[in-house]
Amino acid sequence: MYLKVIILVLTLLYMLFLKLQYKQIGTIGYDKARKNLAIFSTLLLILQSGLRHVGVGPDTYQYMLSFHEHTLWTWQQILHNFIDVYQAGEGKDAGYYLLVKLFSEFSTDYQVFLVFVGIVVFVPLGRFVYKNTERLEDIWVALLLYQTLFYSFFSVTGIRQAIATGFCFLSVECIKAVSYTHLTLPTTSRV
């Protein structure tokens, strides 16, 4: 609870600092100030989500156990799981286990995986907020709504769903750009 308030206060203070600079810089620097605020907010959310203890959230510990189990799976087991899920209709989350296995090629540290998931979730969110707002205050209000409507809790407890949400933010951007070839990648991965 206190961490959410700290994030909101830090972002508010940074926004006020940027507004003071904006008055001195002029209109050209305003877009850069918006981008800086969006990046700052995104980094805070990544840190909040990625550096949490495994005891935070009811599912984080179970996700950690699942992560360690699936890092030990062979690629053949991952392939068989895909076939079981998508052809036989048995099991679930084949895309998530594939993501875990791919990630385990680089690191088997669960905390690093949580930071990676934070990046996958919050970079698209930050980009979405930046592209769909016009003022510094809009970015802060978006962060305020995110924190107060318990979506920050969702990103801590539902890792698979949070990853899917990150892909949805990317998909919205692709739809707006009418780039359907990029849209098929996130929707077919079924994370």
What are the roles of these predicted feature ranges?
Residues 181-187:
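Conserved small/polar residues in nucleotide/adenosyl-binding loops
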Residues 32, 129-148:
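Transmembrane-helix signature of polytopic, membrane-embedded enzymes
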Residues 116-133:
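Transmembrane-helix motifs of polytopic, lipid-linked glycan transferases
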Residues 35-36, 40, 49-77:
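Extracytoplasmic loop-helix module adjacent to an early transmembrane segment
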Residues 139-158, 162-169, 173:
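Membrane-embedded helix bundles of polyisoprenyl
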